[in-house]
Amino acid sequence: MNVSQNLLIEGWRGINHSYALINQYQIRELLKNDDFKIYFKDIPFPTPEWNKKNNSSGLKDFEEKISKLTQPSNKLKIDILYRISFPYRMHGGNANKIFVFGTSEYQKIDNMIYQGEELNEKYINKSIKVITSSNWSKVGFIKEGFKENDVIVIPCGVDLKIFKPINKEKKIKIRKKLNINNDHFVFLNVSAMTWNKGINKLLVAFSEIKRKYSFAKLILKDQSNLYKETAKNYISITKKKFPNLLTDEVLSNIIVISKNLTLKELSELYGSCDAYVSSYRAEGFNMPPLEAAACGIPTILTSGGSTDDYYDPSFVLKIEGTKKTLNDGKNYIEPDLESLISNMSNLIEKRNSLLKKNKAISFIEKNFTWKLISKKLSDLFIND
């Protein structure tokens, strides 16, 4: 009989920030594993607005179980310490093995490492192993000085019980609430309204698409409760820069959703649309496209970045892009506008014979469920 190892997780829970969601999905699967006795230490959120009331995780089915995990006594010997919060706490740690989760959207992690007031909190513990979510993101930690073998890529996953296709009747009902009829072709983007998400490029592309296809619509679901940047504000800024493109006619066909959605509501939103578009410049992983594909809709994604790790022709059309570097050394991919517009047009005109909903869902089921992803994590904890 195996003796359980004491696993202490230090991080966030109860909210819908991507790190907290990843953490909670992983914990749900790890709790099924008898190899671990799991403890949890809450790391403070960076701002009071990040709270369960305003930004609930939506994981009602197992949030209560996760909330019951407690902090260990000071006397307990910890075998494995796993940190998943921001900034990255690379110092100290009293455990046999220490792992820190982090992402490097721009392949650079300057100012992303925690600097505490205590002397021992100012130095990186060289025995720490880094877990990151994509090969693109891995580069940033290696550039910071971590050894390549000490940076392990474990991707994010999808809960296929939550994210799944909806039937025609449900799709019609949801679209009706959004004042969308069956003849409209709807593009969707779910993200924070920040430069790295490439929303300005998407807005310009949609303005061109709208001129050609009068029945096109765009839905922007922002994360303003977490990041304060609203889609409406981003649209306003982009309109000032491109007044002749973002006309009143174009703007009247852009639907903005700012309120928090439950995961069920988010899944239904994915399923009610016709395509998901992410013309991003820099991402650590980019979970929404994979969730959208699980809900049965095709995606259009920037080529060359983090999403290449889960590319499959059954659900991804690639936007051509050029890798560039900002003055501060941050790397990103600049998506090509014409390639983006072309892909959007091709979807509307159904020119893509490789796109297959059932093949897409099968691909995700074989490679990107949280059960599979968490197995990779637990194997690392045990065998490293």
Stretches with model-predicted labels:
Residues 8, 181-197, 203-206, 218-219:
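Conserved donor-binding/catalytic core segment of Leloir-type glycosyltransferases
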Residues 281:
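Aromatic "clamp/platform" in nucleotide-sugar-dependent glycosyltransferases that forms part
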Residues 298-301, 317:
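Short hydrophobic beta-strand element within catalytic cores of glycosyltransferases
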Residues 335, 339, 351-381:
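A charged, aromatic-enriched C-terminal amphipathic alpha-helix characteristic of glycosyltransferases
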